[in-house]
């Protein structure tokens, strides 16, 4: 995770920010506590499955959300409630570089994704659009679909409220928490530039 954070830190230079205008409309995220029902998926969930290529031309997040996981789980958008959490296996978000992959998940109202590991480009894209992701092998191994979990980003804790278990996840550095809380890198950079 540290090398990913270090790599992200290079994007702290707002002159290198390039995002579509609609990304500025990404809502801010309350990073105090995330709580929701778990929907569980396997390993190597790639971006082509998260949002199939035939829908990548869609730029409106709410429209894009309608097709999230369409080929993997056709009922995904119908069963997800705002605040629900995806728990998946290792290498989540592998495959082609699609910023629309984490955007489509975020636009469904999903609060976060928890996985043992994320593909590096998905990891960066998720942070860039202000979507919280957490690494925890224990959570993946011990949380079941339907469990209710609570995530404390500051403490780096994932609590399974159904079973009473607590798992660790490395907390984000403060600047990454700020990017997520602002709704993404574009808004974060815009506000930093405006502040001088």
Regions found by a protein language model. Give the residues of each.
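N-terminal, positively charged, Ser/Thr/Ala/Gly-biased leader segments
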Residues: 3-6, 23-52, 187-196
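Short, low-complexity, charge-dense intrinsically disordered segments
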Residues: 9-19
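C-terminal binding/interaction regions
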Residues: 146-189
């Amino acid at each position: 995770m540290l090398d990913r954070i270090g790599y992200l830190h290079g994007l702290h230079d707002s002159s290198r920010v390039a995002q579509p205008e609609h990304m500025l409309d990404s809502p801010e995220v309350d990073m105090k506590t995330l709580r929701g029902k778990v929907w569980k998926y396997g390993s190597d969930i790639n971006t082509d499955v998260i949002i199939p290529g035939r829908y990548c031309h869609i730029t409106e997040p709410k429209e894009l959300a309608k097709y999230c996981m369409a080929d993997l789980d056709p009922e995904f958008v119908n069963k997800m409630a705002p605040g629900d959490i995806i728990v998946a296996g290792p290498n989540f978000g592998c495959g082609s570089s699609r910023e629309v992959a984490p955007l489509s998940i975020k636009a469904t109202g999903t609060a976060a994704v928890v996985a043992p590991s994320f593909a590096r480009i998905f990891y960066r894209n998720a942070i860039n659009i202000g979507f919280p992701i957490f690494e925890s092998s224990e959570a993946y191994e011990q949380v079941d679909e339907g469990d209710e979990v609570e995530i404390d980003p500051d403490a780096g804790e994932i609590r399974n409220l159904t079973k009473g278990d607590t798992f660790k996840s490395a907390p984000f550095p403060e600047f990454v928490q700020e990017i997520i809380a602002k709704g993404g890198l574009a808004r974060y950079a815009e506000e930093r530039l405006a502040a001088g």
